[in-house]
């Protein structure tokens, strides 16, 4: 005779509202012996099998015809391992009862999760393969502290939320269930009854794999193995090393020519890595890879932060892409978006009926520019979710750095908001103190756990201390995009050369603040979309002048202090704006389409990268005044600039730019060292489709004072061109 389970309790199970399944289901001690109860909708019979002896112990009584079974095993006081033989009509199967297993969330994990200080919560939350009592399966865990009931649903249970309600850990707000026999590749979601009694179907925030849009389920996937940081990769990230970054959108770098569909990760690796290596870039930066629902966001509105997008294949494929880059000596950086997330119903929004991940007040929690939600950085569990994600990509995929998107929108409460549309911080200020602490903590965590990895900030304001260590009060980034330099110099280059003399300071102002941060000079995807034109399209003049302007600008940029970043397509001067739905215009490199104009720019970028890597004077002292000296800074009338770059061991290269279409012959300016100067680069070379004005290989200094220096050189500066002169000594 079974112990009475009230009809109301049984009804709660079939209505999907029972919040504590382990208090009823599984094995329980009663006065008459051990009682076993099972919830198996649509089953006709259930027999208990002893796992050790494989003998039938008893048949469960069909207490409720909808599928609730129970039986007492008389005179038995000791719990034992068992299986259930379940009959579905004439057919039967042996299953492991999920409700016979004890809680598996360790006390330490539970405590760390409860205070939001777990270093790697992705190792605990989500779906993880494990073995318990000799039974293999998947342990599912979800943080949803305000939900009334959570069930795991998926391919393994007909997506029926009645079948597998989960155990609730009150202290941490985590729901848990070990599901035997769940297997790799099966799809799943969490079914919640939220705090308002509404049913919600949510993807796993910690899923390691997700379905391709428009489908939204998570996919059971193994946690990737850790990839140790190597000394070679660590060295390539250092401040005194050459860093030239090729920014890539995987969905449009190159596509299948027959159907315009994406290449997969392995196909991309086979084509992209050799190309980047040949072009001389030291790093690749991928636009966001975390799973995202809307192609048009380019990945900047992610929902599956722990899932490499399935657009291009599997997580294993993405990992192979990174491995191939490392084999070629190329480091890999990932765009990372911890600033906001879309409001799709299967995602993080109103997760358990409350504003769990976001702010409840739209003045704090809604981003009006992007129609997205803003993370609540004041909540420990949310900070933990995000900072752990940074570690996940760096440790588990062997990435060498992250570039953090839209930092300014995170650290200012009034970002893009009018008066009255934002809430001041506790001191009445506009800074988002919680976001600032989150960034400091994340960068500290990266430095502590993945030594040698770098973080780069896209920060568009003059916020102080972005690249100052967090231990010294800064945000702790290693580099910052120099948005001011980019905006000023592009504004200058877009002007007709006749008017450039009136805007001369736009090319020099960057040196006023050059040593305030560690800078990357970015010509990114943002500059070639939304009607801004391509870089080539920004340049004034006829076709010859457009290409010459761009070549001169690249020469100036590669000589200027700061690491380099160039978005794909700009290395061969694509003429139209970037379109994420199509491949780059590679056909422009063919004679019949682009002539040799585009080949010339491509060859120049290749040579710039190799010269840059080969000469320490162009990178070693980017962050020190000892590495830079203006030689000609005030020649507005001729739009000429000249500066010297220096290395620690005394190597010197002079960079000279002429931003008018008039060649400047016999142009004299002072130099610091007497001797010969070899012309190692000329953007006007015929090799690059220029007019081939130059200095016949080298020039020598003369004891003729100029520009407050005792020695000077007299050079020919080609029209719309930059030349590099390397000091060779006397």
Curated annotation (Swiss-Prot):
It is an enzyme of class 2 (transferase). The active site is at 405 (nucleophile), 458 (proton donor). One of its GO terms (cellular component) is cytosol. Pathway: Glycan biosynthesis; glycogen biosynthesis. Its EC number is 2.4.1.18. GO terms for molecular function: 1,4-alpha-glucan branching enzyme activity; cation binding; hydrolase activity, hydrolyzing O-glycosyl compounds. Keywords: Carbohydrate metabolism, Glycogen biosynthesis, Glycogen metabolism, Glycosyltransferase, Transferase. InterPro entries: A-amylase/branching_C (IPR006048), Branching_enzy (IPR037439), GlgB (IPR006407), GlgB_N (IPR054169), GlgB_N_E_set_prok (IPR044143), Glyco_hydro_13_cat_dom (IPR006047), Glyco_hydro_13_N (IPR004193), Glyco_hydro_b (IPR013780). GO terms for biological process: glycogen biosynthetic process. It catalyses: Transfers a segment of a (1->4)-alpha-D-glucan chain to a primary hydroxy group in a similar glucan chain. NCBIfam families: branching_enzym, PRK05402.1, PRK12313.1. Belongs to the glycosyl hydrolase 13 family. GlgB subfamily. Catalyzes the formation of the alpha-1,6-glucosidic linkages in glycogen by scission of a 1,4-alpha-linked oligosaccharide from growing alpha-1,4-glucan chains and the subsequent attachment of the oligosaccharide to the alpha-1,6 position. HAMAP family: GlgB. PANTHER family: 1,4-ALPHA-GLUCAN-BRANCHING ENZYME. Monomer. This is 1,4-alpha-glucan branching enzyme GlgB.
